[in-house]
Amino acid sequence: MANDLFNSFMTGPDENGRFGDFGGRFVSETLMPLILELEEQYENAKTDESFWAEMNDLWTHYVGRPSPLYFAERLTDHLGGAKVYMKRDELNHTGAHKINNVLGQIILARRMGKTRIIAETGAGQHGVATATVCAKFGLKCVVYMGAHDVERQAPNVFRMRLLGAEVVPVTSGRGTLKDAMNDALRDWVTNVRDTFYCIGTVAGPHPYPAMVRDFQAIIGKEVRTQMTAAEGRFPDTVIAAIGGGSNAMGLFYPFLDDKEVGIIGVEAGGKGVNAKMEHCASLTGGRPGVLHGNRTYLLQDDDGQILEGFSISAGLDYPGIGPEHAWLHDIGRAQYVSITDVEALEAFQLCCELEGIIPALEPSHALAHVMKIAPDLPSDHIICMNMCGRGDKDIFTVAKALGFEMGEFA
């Protein structure tokens, strides 16, 4: 594998589902047969022209791909340095990148004869995407969501229920994404016969990290084509926010072997990366461990217990990160930084005022880092950030943070 990696950063995972020291398949004996069946089905689908024909048709006519590549002219002028482009994946059907992956997994689930789909969700976007595709195909849908996230993402909870999904509030732990994923895994163990677990990020046991990455890679593939058409070359830097890391991996992966393209992932810095762990910056402030079926960087205490972390963004409020990101971090191919809640809120407001785009709090973190670095870069430097979600779901959270009074969602 070392020789392969010398030539390419795109060959992982290996036959054991590992990216260097990260990844793998740490699951119960009950789940192992289903995991192996899923791996076999996906390996077959990857070379099946009919599978990709169905995917491409749905991406085009149901999701609305390709999503636009947008030159943020006023933001660029305001920052006074690099040219800033936005990959507008918030314009997808359901308002985020999540549906890119959900379509692929549910097509696989149907091929496997599964009739019940379960999912975890934090910001609610993966839950909405899963409920949407289940409604389209007539499948039962159950979404696990932390009770704290149910409160701060009320619009998406209502959307999921409108789409026919059962939303299960999870009260264990701090009631966030980690806890929702724990309960979804418990459900899967007891309902393996008819149930498919549609994971929303590039985490979990192999083959999920690679499979989700491959479905999301449509983002970066489109950017390669679109940026070449717009500028005659690839961007100098690509930037994306990271919770588990699926939108980022989707943008990054097609550029991994283009050494001239800088790659920056932006983690949730919460109240600041400090010993109190009031953040969700696993790479910046964590260390390796095992969670949800894979080895990766995690927020842990001295005894190895998983900590809760904190972020204003429900979609970034996860104490781990996808194993491929952990590997890219360790080998130095990608740089990972953190942005605080305050910085993300500033970027949120600036994007609204200058570009007429209301971003989700997740990509607001990436945009905040763009605002930090763009002024010091030359005017011919091209940055492409992934606008991975729209901000409708976050207006109540932002209003509260900024001190505005709003009526309760009804």
Swiss-Prot record:
Catalyzed reaction equations: (1S,2R)-1-C-(indol-3-yl)glycerol 3-phosphate + L-serine = D-glyceraldehyde 3-phosphate + L-tryptophan + H2O
PANTHER family, A to Z: TRYPTOPHAN SYNTHASE, TRYPTOPHAN SYNTHASE-RELATED
Gene Ontology, cellular component aspect = cytoplasm
Q: How does it assemble?
A: Tetramer of two alpha and two beta chains.
Superkingdom to which the source organism belongs: Bacteria
Gene3D superfamilies tied to this protein? 3.40.50.1100
Report the pathway entry. Answer: Amino-acid biosynthesis; L-tryptophan biosynthesis; L-tryptophan from chorismate: step 5/5
**Which family is this sequence assigned to?**
Belongs to the TrpB family.
What sort of enzyme, by top EC class, is this? lyase
Task: Note the InterPro entries from the entry.
Answer: Trp_synth_b_CS, Trp_synth_beta, Trp_synth_beta/beta-like, TrpB-like_PALP, TrpB-like_PALP_sf
N6-(pyridoxal phosphate)lysine modification sites?
Answer: K98
- Tell me the protein's name: Tryptophan synthase beta chain
